[in-house]
């Protein structure tokens, strides 16, 4: 099931969720399942004594409005902005238009209108978030929250006139600040409860919207809506969603023409599997020497043996020549050295390396003659702005993160991915704390919710007492009628690579 959710992000950790319509209530029920409400008080062991502490549930969104797949299919020409609403349009009137002024007054701070994508690919590695669209955080709302433990109070600092930990006071203030009758209904939610259950957001919208929501807060706080964001928000929904068979299309990484026309590149030393990036994403990456002719390669090879300085100079000049004649197209150039790109007129958007050179040595075990030059390139990369990771796959994800931040119009596709995805449903919820949904998607594995699962898919039940969860009645009926493949895996004790390999061989 596809979904568009209007939301207002107030902070990274602490916020309130509110219900405006029956549809939103259904969304809460779908996401939360039959889980118990958290206790108002708990105890924490302090040496030999048990100390009572208040239990405050950290949450991250205010849900303003929700439209399901039926609505989208009935209104395929609506844009995201049409559905969510804004002060600049009138069709249809939604919660966004009526509630934003009240929220602004309640928290005594201006709200920024626009689009926002929360944690699709994080700077610390891949992580798929659970909500889709829109509104924006208020400036100066939240200072650093301190969450000492799951059993302790969540301490927050805010410029609001009401204590954010006092749900009753907020209900009362909200009711006085808005004309909406249901505006007094607020509820705290666990982020992971929503995340585990909400696997039904459409992958196409997630992937196509990604580049438009990078650096949103910084850009929007300056008072201008980027054209790319406006274009995405006003694109008809039918162009963002796959409306036919309901199958999720493979994610793609492709470029539109760069308005500036300048070639961009990244620095990645030998032994960092740059060839893997260029072969996996041929529409995005190109190795620095790929356009070189046989004659140019021969001249460079001769100079490399006799005059290293002349070799590097000619190398940069050759890159510059192919930049000028358009041989690199609009792709990102992967180079082993910064000087080659900068001297060749290429804009460097990132420098990357594995944090431990021993990993590089292992990658070059079959090419031992290149280890010395690889070490020289590795040691030359340092200073502010250098991106590192101990794992090559995670480093490549950070490269993709940088690319999507710097190139408007980028959508994610793995060029080596199978044309038909493996469809998998995790009965007990996707183990997001252990595994990367992005990694599964990149390897041709589509994770769907139980109500999306067909008999052609695979149902995975996770072992371990902490993975057991009661299912709502409608989903229990779906489980009993499922006739496809079923498998039980200890997913919490498997690496992501092992999980991908196992699912791929089923």
From Swiss-Prot:
- Which InterPro entries does the record cross-reference, listed alphabetically? Phytoreo_S7 (IPR009873)
- Statement: the UniProt record of this protein carries the keyword RNA-binding: yes
Q: Which UniProt keywords apply?
A: Capsid protein, Host cytoplasm, RNA-binding, Virion
Region of interest (RNA-binding), residue spans: 128-249, 325-355
This protein's source sits in the domain of life called Viruses
One Gene Ontology term of the molecular function aspect? RNA binding
Residue ranges of the TM segments: none
- Carries keyword Protease? no
Instruction: Give the UniProt subcellular location, in the record's own words.
Output: Virion; Host cytoplasm
Cellular component terms (Gene Ontology): host cell cytoplasm; viral capsid
**Role noted for this protein:** Probable component of the transcriptional machinery present in the inner capsid. Displays dsRNA binding activity and may play an important role in the sorting of viral RNA and virion assembly. Together with the RNA-directed RNA polymerase P1 and capping enzyme P5, forms an transcriptional complex positioned near the channels situated at each of the five-fold vertices of the core.
Q: Which family does it belong to?
A: Belongs to the phytoreovirus protein P7 family.
- What name does the UniProt record give this protein? Protein P7
Protein's organism: Rice dwarf virus (isolate O)
């Amino acid at each position: 099931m596809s979904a568009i959710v209007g939301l207002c992000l107030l902070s990274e950790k602490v916020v309130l969720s509110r219900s405006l319509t029956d549809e939103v209530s259904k969304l809460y029920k779908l996401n939360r399942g039959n889980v118990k409400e958290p206790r108002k008080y708990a105890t924490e062991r302090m040496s030999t004594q048990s100390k009572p502490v208040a239990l405050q549930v950290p949450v991250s969104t205010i849900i303003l409005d929700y439209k399901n797949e039926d609505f989208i299919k009935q209104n395929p020409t609506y844009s995201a902005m049409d559905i969510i609403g804004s002060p600049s349009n009138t069709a249809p009137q939604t919660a966004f238009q009526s509630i934003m002024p009240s929220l602004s007054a309640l928290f005594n701070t201006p709200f920024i209108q626009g689009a926002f994508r929360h944690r699709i690919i994080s700077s610390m590695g891949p992580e798929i978030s659970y909500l889709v669209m829109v509104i924006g955080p208020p400036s100066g709302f939240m200072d650093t929250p301190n969450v000492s433990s799951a059993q302790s109070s969540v301490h927050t600092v805010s410029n609001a006139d009401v204590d954010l930990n006092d749900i009753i006071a907020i209900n009362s203030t909200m009711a006085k600040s808005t004309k909406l009758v249901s505006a007094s209904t607020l509820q705290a939610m666990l982020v992971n409860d929503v995340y585990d259950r909400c696997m039904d957001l459409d992958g196409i919208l997630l992937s196509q919207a990604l580049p438009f929501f990078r650096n949103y807060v910084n850009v929007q706080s300056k008072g201008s809506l980027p054209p790319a964001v406006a274009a995405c928000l006003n694109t008809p929904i039918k162009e963002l969603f796959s409306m036919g068979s309901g199958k999720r299309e493979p994610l793609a990484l492709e470029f539109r023409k760069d308005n500036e026309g300048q070639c961009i590149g990244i620095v990645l030393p030998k032994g960092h599997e740059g060839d893997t990036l260029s072969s996996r994403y041929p529409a995005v990456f190109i190795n620095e020497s790929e356009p070189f002719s046989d004659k140019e390669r021969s001249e460079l090879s001769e100079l490399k043996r006799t005059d290293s300085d002349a070799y590097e100079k000619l190398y940069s000049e050759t890159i510059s020549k192919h930049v000028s004649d358009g041989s690199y197209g609009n792709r990102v150039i992967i180079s082993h050295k910064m000087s080659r790109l900068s001297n060749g007129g290429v804009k460097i958007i990132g420098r990357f390396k594995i944090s431990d050179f021993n990993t590089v040595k292992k990658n070059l075990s079959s090419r031992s003659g290149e280890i010395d030059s690889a070490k020289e390139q590795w040691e030359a990369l340092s200073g502010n702005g250098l991106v590192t990771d101990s794992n090559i796959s995670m480093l490549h994800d950070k490269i993709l993160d940088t690319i999507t931040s710097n190139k408007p119009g980028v959508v994610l596709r793995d060029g080596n991915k199978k044309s038909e995805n493996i469809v998998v449903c995790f009965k007990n919820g996707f183990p997001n704390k252990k595994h990367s949904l992005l990694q599964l998607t990149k390897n041709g594995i589509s994770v769907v919710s139980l109500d999306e699962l067909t008999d052609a898919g695979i149902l995975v039940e996770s072992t371990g007492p902490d993975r057991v969860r009661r299912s709502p009645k409608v989903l229990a009926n779906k489980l009993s009628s499922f006739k496809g493949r079923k498998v039980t895996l200890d997913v919490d004790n498997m690496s992501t690579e092992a999980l991908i390999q196992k699912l791929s061989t089923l």
